Amino acid sequence: MEIKIEKTLTPKAKPDESSLGFGQYFTDHMFIMDYTREKGWHDARIVPFSNLSLHPACTVFHYGAEIFEGMKAYRTAEGNIQLFRPEQNFARLNSSAERMRLPLVDEAFALEALETLIKIDADWVPHAPGTSLYIRPFLFGADPKLGVHSIDRSVFIIILSPVGSYYKEGINPVKIMIETEDVRAVKGGTGYTKCGGNYGASNRAGEKAEQAGYSQVLWLDGVERKYIEEVGAMNVMFKINGEIVTPALTGSILPGITRKSILQILRDEGANVSERLLSIDELIEALEAGTLEEGWGCGTAAVVSPIGQLYYNGKTYTINNGKIGDTTQKLYDTLTGIQWGKIEDTRGWVHPIK
């Protein structure tokens, strides 16, 4: 399929790279592609970044037919631009689409479209250390009618945003509140997808945590409220008495690409790694016994984020004296080193934009 290109006549001024924040600025262009049941995907185009015009009865507004992805483009010290495992993101996008009964995209074409878009907006990829170009592909149902029904029309869009650190703490330890009332997802639901509803449903607990001075919520399972699942924007890992434990993917947890990459790095280095059920009781016992050595979250937006404090049932627990642990620091350095081209990629994870 040909990608039609319309370049902006009024380029925007670039933001100050020292204060990018997250998701506040957007590049000059975006990719759009339409779908109808009769024609399939068509009218692939790159156009100036602008607002969308949608029918008030559009499916996405009423029935949550929406999925998205998140990835980044990095600028190396040599000035080159590269992606990190983008094929994994588009495969996960299609996994989410299948669950939500949205049309699948051609993964190779989606990557081609992304590469073309990045080349056009290449000067938006920031140069400052720790910055990157965040990539947000999203897909939604666009039928102009009410009623729960099979989706006949959809739209696929990619937008780009230069970003700094996801958390204001940066690589410094974050404080996490363990949620005991609300749940994020259950087995058989949409927990393993990146659909907007998962995040919308987390807002109440997230707001409660924020008001109490915590960066994120750590979710327990939706049935027994017993097993650790994930943080709102990250998968989680804990080092307990030398064993690195991360919750197993049971269908209610997002299969993170950063998680997958870290597990491979750890196993390649011979670390003692387990993907298993981890109860809140086991975690608290390890904290009280002093055997919980480190904890960290991991995801595309935050990369690796050390957990310095947990709040549970009215009590505050400090991990590793509130400092970043050696394993956490090494993982952060290794992963970001590969992403920014400082460390040789020996696993075929880097995808250069040529």
Residue ranges of predicted features:
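Helix-start/capping segments and mature chain N-termini
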Residues: 1-117, 138, 145-354
